[in-house]
């Protein structure tokens, strides 16, 4: 854990987590290598989600006869390895919402409050920059997730970094390295799913519910296990059906959550419209000429980049697991859809939180030492100053954020579990039962070092994933050319 969260001391009070360097450098490299795909591909990605290019898929002419008896030495069905035209399990929109549900959550509320308290308003600017760069990383990893996925005879999809590291690096003559990196990633994603994707989420949700109902005097005080049991049952009902069931829930919850939260943020902003100009002045001045911030401009930049990386997980590889289940015959089409995630998560939702905090005067150094639960209450108070009943809405939102994050991360963890232990029903149910048990534990326990460990697991995923992304970037470029050619042919 200490190795993952080792901080490089730059002097002047500035310490930077080393994991930020490969994430940001990688995102910048992909932005340049793919010629600003995060900008020039933005409207194309929206059109894909809207269904404008559905005719490009031509699925009715590309049905695949799948053998359930012939397999490779690795247990893969050769008819479904990188086969173009197979249906997959979910739509572009469902894959997008499933992946978004794992990232849009408590970090957008609590993490942003802490970031702007430490780094000042200027951290918002660098958070947006990092979010825009991260769009390119998401494009690369999610394109690879579809290209190298496995699809079983019954249509069940298995995908993500485990598969593009194994198959992709094998195609480059690096089979041994690919296998090692894939196993490491699988171990890390399982650890992350039980911790940050499960226990942390339900723990923070329960703390907020307990606080809003009276704190130590609440009727729920001491009954975290009961809250966890209810959440575990709800999670279990959804995850038992796999990605199709998860996507059916997330494609309703995620748009609802984002619309409610952004609408409330805009209400606060417009209610204080006379302060909007000053807020943006604080953001731009603070980004380049901060005063009273540890480490000056570098300190502000670090806080913005850190929050973006922790929030949208671009380069971590998790989202490619959800996107690999999409119904498409062009891998790059889903990569294009995926680049919307950091934009929605960081550029839109995180920025809204930051603006509300700045406008309502809640960006102060005294708040820098807050923990996540306290930071949620700080954000809640900022909204409450304009919308008196908003804390109740935020409580519901936090529960939904936590719930949707848990069901998506259960899928991520299961994919790693299946890669290591096999795709049998016995192994599937073993993982899902364990996952639900950890929901109860997370709600009842005081987590402490467990959270540090789970955070380390999530960012450890970045190491094997980024190695694969850089090596396989030319493959992604080929897929992009193929898809853009198909779109141009459709227009003609």
Predicted region positions:
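Alpha-helical membrane segments and immediately flanking helix-loop junctions
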Residues: 63-115, 144-147, 153-168, 184, ...
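Selective recognition of specific alpha-helical transmembrane segments in multi-pass small-molecule
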Residues: 130-141, 227-243, 254-274, 306-307, ...
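Extracellular/periplasmic helix-exit of transmembrane alpha-helices
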Residues: 141-154, 264-282, 293-296, 325-328, ...
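Transmembrane helix-loop junctions in multi-pass membrane proteins
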Residues: 33-38, 108-111, 121, 193-206, ...
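Transmembrane-helix boundary/entry motifs in multi-pass membrane transporters
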Residues: 49-64, 78-96, 131, 142, ...
């Amino acid at each position: 854990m200490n190795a993952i969260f080792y901080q490089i001391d730059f002097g002047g009070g500035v310490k930077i987590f080393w994991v930020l360097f490969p994430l940001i450098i990688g995102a910048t490299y992909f932005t340049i290598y793919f010629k600003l795909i995060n900008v020039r591909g933005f409207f194309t990605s929206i059109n894909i989600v809207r269904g404008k290019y559905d005719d490009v898929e031509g699925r009715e002419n590309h049905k695949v006869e799948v053998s359930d008896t012939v397999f490779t030495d690795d247990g893969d069905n050769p008819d479904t390895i990188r086969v173009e035209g197979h249906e997959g399990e979910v739509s572009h929109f469902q894959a997008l919402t499933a992946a978004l549900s794992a990232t849009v959550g408590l970090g957008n509320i609590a993490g942003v409050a802490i970031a702007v308290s430490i780094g000042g308003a200027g951290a918002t600017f660098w958070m947006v920059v990092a979010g825009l760069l991260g769009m390119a990383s998401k494009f690369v990893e999610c394109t690879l997730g579809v290209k190298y996925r496995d699809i079983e005879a019954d249509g069940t999809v298995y995908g993500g970094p485990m598969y593009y590291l194994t198959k992709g690096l094998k195609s480059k003559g690096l089979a041994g390295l690919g296998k090692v990196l894939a196993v490491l990633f699988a171990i890390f994603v399982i650890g992350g799913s039980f911790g940050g994707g499960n226990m942390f989420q339900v723990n923070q949700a329960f703390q907020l519910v307990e606080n809003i109902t009276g704190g130590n005097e609440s009727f729920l005080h001491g009954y975290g296990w009961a809250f966890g049991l209810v959440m575990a049952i709800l999670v279990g009902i959804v995850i038992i059906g796999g990605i199709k069931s998860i996507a059916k829930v997330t494609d309703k919850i995620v748009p609802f959550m984002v619309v409610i939260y952004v609408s409330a943020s805009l209400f606060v902003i417009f209610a204080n419209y006379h302060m909007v100009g000053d807020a943006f002045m604080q953001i731009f001045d603070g980004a380049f000429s901060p005063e009273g911030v540890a480490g000056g401009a570098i300190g502000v930049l670090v806080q913005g980049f850190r929050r973006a990386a922790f929030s949208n997980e671009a380069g971590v590889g998790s989202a490619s697991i959800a996107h690999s289940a999409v119904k498409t015959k062009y891998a790059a089409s889903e990569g294009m859809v995926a680049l919307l995630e950091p934009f929605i998560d960081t550029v839109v939702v995180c920025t809204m939180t930051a603006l509300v905090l700045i406008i309502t005067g809640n960006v102060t150094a005294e708040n820098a030492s807050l923990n996540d639960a306290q930071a949620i209450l700080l954000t809640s108070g900022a909204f409450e100053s304009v919308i008196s009943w908003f804390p109740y809405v935020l409580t519901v939102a936090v529960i939904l954020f936590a719930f949707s994050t848990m069901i998506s991360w259960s899928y991520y963890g299961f994919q790693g579990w299946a890669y290591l232990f096999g795709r049998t029903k016995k192994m599937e149910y073993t993982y899902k039962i364990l996952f639900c048990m950890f929901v109860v534990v997370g709600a009842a326990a005081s987590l402490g070092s467990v959270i540090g460990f789970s955070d380390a697991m999530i960012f450890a995923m970045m190491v094997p994933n980024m190695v694969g992304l850089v090596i396989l970037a030319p493959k992604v470029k080929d897929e992009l050319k193929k898809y853009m050619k198909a779109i141009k042919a459709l227009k003609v």
